[in-house]
């Protein structure tokens, strides 16, 4: 049975309580994806590469841990981008999950009003996997912060998988570079695209770490950091 172990990079800037927290805390909660293991709850986040060939095998293993998976994808974080970019994210997600043979629907909700639409909430009530793709994390969290949507998101968190890439990963932490996250991973700041770019994000985050309680989780491309 194929297995894939997600990787976590502990950056050189992570020392003292930061490195120890990663090594002895969440690090110990990582596990090998195994299709024989049935999960009730998981958060899975990656730095970049959502819906692309490089992450296909990881997604196949990841989503096989849920019985009767029904995936909803949201490109809401890119809701302020062009129509062409919206279509790009939609087509990428649709083709990706079709190739995996999974039941899937892409939700075209660009903002808070569209997120709170009845058809979106109805689909959320049927799903057990939600995947947020990349874009602007502040726009994403502002858009999904409605009572009806959050009630369903928390329900899915308890019975299935919440997945996110880039901006979709950043919102899972307690603090973001700008603003606050959902606090599903407490005492954390999540940095995507680690080793690619955005080094100013990392340096700014380290400054925050030196002032307070927030821990740094750096995410690479095509790997998942998972919490169960």
Label each region the model flagged.
Residues 133, 139-145, 149-200:
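Class I SAM-dependent methyltransferase SAM-binding "motif I" and its flanking Rossmann-like core
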Residues 1-4, 16-26:
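N-terminal, intrinsically disordered charge-dense segments
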Residues 42-67, 77-88, 96, 176, ...:
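C-terminal and late-domain segments of enzyme folds
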Residues 78-139:
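Portal/gating segments that form or line small-molecule/metal binding sites
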Residues 12-13, 24, 35:
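Serine residues within intrinsically disordered or low-complexity segments
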């Amino acid at each position: 049975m194929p297995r894939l172990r997600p990787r976590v990079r502990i950056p050189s800037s992570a020392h003292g309580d930061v490195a120890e927290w990663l090594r002895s805390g969440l690090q110990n909660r990582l596990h090998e994806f195994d299709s024989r293991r049935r999960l009730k709850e998981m958060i899975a986040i990656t730095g970049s590469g959502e819906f692309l060939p490089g992450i296909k095998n990881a997604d196949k293993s990841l989503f096989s841990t849920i019985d009767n998976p029904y995936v909803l994808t949201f490109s809401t974080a890119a809701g302020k981008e062009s129509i062409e970019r919206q279509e790009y994210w939609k087509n990428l997600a649709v083709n990706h999950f079709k190739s995996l043979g999974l039941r899937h629907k892409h939700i075209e909700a660009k903002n808070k009003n569209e997120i709170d639409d009845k058809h979106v909430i109805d689909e959320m009530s049927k799903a057990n996997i939600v995947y947020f793709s990349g874009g602007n994390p502040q726009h994403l969290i502002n858009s999904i912060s409605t009572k009806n949507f959050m009630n369903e998101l928390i329900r899915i968190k308890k019975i299935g998988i919440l997945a996110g890439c880039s901006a979709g990963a950043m919102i899972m932490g307690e603090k973001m570079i700008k603003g606050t996250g959902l606090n599903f991973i407490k005492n954390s700041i999540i940095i995507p695209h680690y080793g690619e770019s955005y080094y100013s994000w990392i340096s700014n985050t380290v400054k925050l770490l030196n002032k307070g309680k927030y821990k740094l989780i750096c995410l690479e491309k095509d790997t998942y950091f998972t919490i169960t």
